[in-house]
């Protein structure tokens, strides 16, 4: 064990001498209070340490003790419903242990509860051959999630002993006979946060991640195992969009990282989620959620740790064959922490003062998303989707964090402050957003909704783009100067914007929209477009289109229950539009 001495302190950065024999990214205990830190730079005898706790009051001459291990997380039953800080310290347990609403410095509480007993049900027998990643048993962790206990990476052999009953996470549940002797398996594993967890093979992202949000699913779809960025200026709805994703996404587990954002936003999640029902299981949303709270007033160095802690927890659930959504709000705050520490290290600054390695750090994080064949002898697939919010100052998408993120992710949901001011939510700008997964996921949509899904989607997108081109002319000379066909396009584009793209996050029906309902809503609007064009071509007055009563039905369809809408309302509306538009023809 290396024991050094502090010689310099600069905010969260501490320099210690006498650290020969230490390793990069080794966790150290700093000062008399034993603050947690991580070595980020080594010279022959000196180590530069980023400290994950407040450094006020520590002084040169105090000791620095190496632990010999990298920054790691504890993985096992007890993570769901938990709330951690950036280095996986359980906030509720710290409050109980210290009887304080603040985190005392140097506090050391285990990440997983050591006194809770979990009912372990074995799924293998003595004598069975097992590989790393094999499931040896299960624990019913919450009402929603059955936690699968895996053979740790690096252990292959034969089951020598397997137990059944109630155990804590530290008690042995299995003994595996390997070539290097017997290995004891507990329900808890430790894993270094900076090292991606291995898998057999990465699979192509061809299944859409259904979010229930029409603009995201239909127009800018994200695939399971994909990565997406949500950049937007302040007040444009990044956090509400991420809350909606956490509530409604077609995943088994949600890891929500509050990385340097306001404490009130984390409070909102903690207060809302225990009362909300999960659409898939009918249980509470909190039962499938892991919260990592690293708010703006916490030490900046821990922002980087919180991102890596979150993705490692997500990969662990992925290895069980589950689907995981990781939302990070906001990666800009992590980048700002990197900039601050880089400045204190006196490194050469890159663009706008960010370190030169900004893009490689972002890439390391986003590249850990993916749909994989999990380790183990059986065929098991899991995925991690990453949705990172970006907060560009002044909504400038050309700044380094946004531009580097866009090089890495394939889905870009651009939030627009102008749309938010017009009360258009979700405020995702359909002209600047894009998804590069559309060709990959189109097959799923065609198979599960309708063969013409891609045609309808592309036509609708074309109408919205055409409307943007016509707006300049309309502002100069008014809509009456346009040809009849283009007046129809303006009317249908308005219907698409107001009745399809807008969605009420607080309405019990409209908050979530299924793929079939999305497809049928789009089909109704595009059928109205084609029939309106026919009517106008046969002499109908385009000004009278806005007076037909079927338009009111179209405006109300998002509030209709799905079954009633698809079975009865869609045929009724198509029949009604035929008769009403037919009556307009002279």
Curated annotation (Swiss-Prot):
Keywords: ATP synthesis, ATP-binding, Cell membrane, Hydrogen ion transport, Ion transport, Membrane, Nucleotide-binding, Translocase, Transport
Enzyme class: translocase
Biological process (GO), any one: proton motive force-driven plasma membrane ATP synthesis
Catalytic reactions of this protein: ATP + H2O + 4 H(+)(in) = ADP + phosphate + 5 H(+)(out)
CDD domains: ATP-synt_V_A-type_alpha_C, ATP-synt_V_A-type_alpha_N, V_A-ATPase_A
Binding site for ATP: 232-239
UniProt cross-references to InterPro entries, sorted A to Z: ATP-synt_VA_C (IPR055190), ATP-synth_a_Xtn (IPR031686), ATP_synth_asu-like_sf (IPR023366), ATP_synth_asu_arc (IPR005726), ATPase_a/bsu_AS (IPR020003), ATPase_F1/V1/A1_a/bsu_N (IPR004100), ATPase_F1/V1/A1_a/bsu_N_sf (IPR036121), ATPase_F1/V1/A1_a/bsu_nucl-bd (IPR000194)
GO CC, alphabetical: plasma membrane; proton-transporting two-sector ATPase complex, catalytic domain
Principal location class: membrane
Localization (cell): Cell membrane
EC number(s) on file: 7.1.2.2
Pfam families: ATP-synt_ab, ATP-synt_ab_N, ATP-synt_ab_Xtn, ATP-synt_VA_C
Topology in membrane: Peripheral membrane protein
Alphabetized PROSITE patterns for the sequence: ATPASE_ALPHA_BETA
GO molecular function: ATP binding; proton-transporting ATP synthase activity, rotational mechanism; proton-transporting ATPase activity, rotational mechanism
PANTHER family registered for this protein in UniProt: H(+)-TRANSPORTING TWO-SECTOR ATPASE, V-TYPE PROTON ATPASE CATALYTIC SUBUNIT A
Assigned protein family: Belongs to the ATPase alpha/beta chains family.
Subunit structure as annotated in this protein's UniProt entry: Has multiple subunits with at least A(3), B(3), C, D, E, F, H, I and proteolipid K(x).
Known role: Component of the A-type ATP synthase that produces ATP from ADP in the presence of a proton gradient across the membrane. The A chain is the catalytic subunit.
Name by which UniProt lists this protein: A-type ATP synthase subunit A
């Amino acid at each position: 064990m290396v024991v050094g001495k502090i010689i310099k302190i600069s905010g969260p950065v501490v320099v210690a001498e006498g650290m020969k024999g230490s390793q990069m990214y080794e966790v150290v205990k700093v000062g008399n209070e034993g603050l947690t830190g991580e070595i980020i730079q080594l010279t022959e005898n000196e180590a530069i340490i980023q400290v994950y706790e407040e450094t006020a009051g520590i002084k040169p001459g105090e000791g620095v003790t190496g632990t010999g291990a990298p920054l790691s997380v504890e993985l096992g039953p007890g993570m769901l419903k938990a709330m951690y800080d950036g280095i996986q310290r359980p906030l509720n347990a710290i409050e109980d242990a210290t009887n304080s609403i603040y985190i005392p410095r140097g506090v050391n509480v285990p990440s997983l509860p050591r006194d809770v007993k979990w009912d372990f049900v074995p799924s293998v027998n003595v004598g069975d051959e097992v590989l790393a990643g094999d499931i040896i048993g299960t624990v019913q962790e919450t009402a929603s999630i059955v936690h699968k206990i895996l053979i740790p990476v690096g252990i292959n052999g034969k089951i020598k002993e397997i137990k059944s009953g109630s155990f804590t996470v530290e008690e042995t549940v299995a003994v595996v006979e390997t070539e290097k002797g017997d290995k004891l398996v507990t329900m808890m594993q430790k894993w270094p946060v900076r090292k991606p967890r291995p898998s057999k093979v990465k699979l192509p992202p061809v299944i859409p991640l259904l979010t229930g949000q029409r603009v995201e699913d239909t127009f800018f779809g994200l695939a399971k195992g994909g990565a997406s960025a949500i950049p937007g200026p302040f007040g444009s709805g990044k956090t509400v969009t991420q809350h909606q994703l956490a509530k409604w996404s077609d995943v088994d587990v949600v890891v929500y990282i509050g990385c340097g954002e306001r404490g009130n936003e984390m409070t909102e999640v903690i207060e809302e989620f225990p009362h909300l029902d999960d659409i898939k299981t009918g249980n509470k949303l909190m039962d499938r959620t892991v919260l990592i709270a690293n708010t703006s007033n916490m030490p900046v160095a821990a922002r980087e740790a919180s991102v890596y802690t979150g993705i490692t927890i997500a990969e662990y659930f992925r290895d069980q064959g589950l689907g995981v959504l990781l939302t990070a709000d906001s990666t800009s705050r992590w980048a700002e922490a990197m900039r601050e520490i880089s400045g204190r290290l006196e490194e050469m600054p890159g663009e706008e003062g960010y370190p030169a390695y900004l893009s490689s750090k972002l890439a390391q994080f986003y590249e850990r998303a993916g749909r994989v064949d999990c380790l183990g002898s059986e065929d098991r697939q899991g995925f991690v989707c990453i949705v990172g919010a970006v907060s560009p100052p002044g909504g400038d998408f050309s700044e380094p964090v946004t531009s580097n993120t866009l090089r890495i992710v394939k889905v870009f949901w651009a939030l627009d402050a102008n749309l938010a001011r017009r009360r258009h939510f979700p405020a995702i700008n359909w002209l600047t957003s894009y998804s590069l997964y559309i060709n990959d996921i189109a097959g799923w949509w065609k198979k599960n909704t309708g063969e013409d899904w891609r045609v309808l989607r592309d036509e609708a997108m074309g109408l919205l783009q055409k409307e943007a081109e016509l707006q300049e002319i309309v502002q100069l000379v008014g809509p009456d100067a346009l040809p009849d066909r283009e007046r129809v396009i303006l009317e249908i584009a308005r219907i698409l914007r107001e009745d399809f793209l807008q969605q009420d996050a607080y309405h019990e029906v409209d908050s979530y929209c299924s793929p079939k309902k999305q497809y049928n809503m789009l089909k109704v609007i595009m059928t109205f477009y084609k029939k309106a064009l026919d009517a106008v071509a046969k002499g109908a007055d385009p000004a009278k289109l806005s007076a037909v009563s079927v338009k009111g039905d179209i405006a109300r369809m998002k509030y209709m229950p799905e079954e009633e809408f698809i079975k009865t309302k869609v045929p009724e509306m198509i029949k009604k539009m035929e008769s009403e538009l037919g009556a307009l023809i002279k």
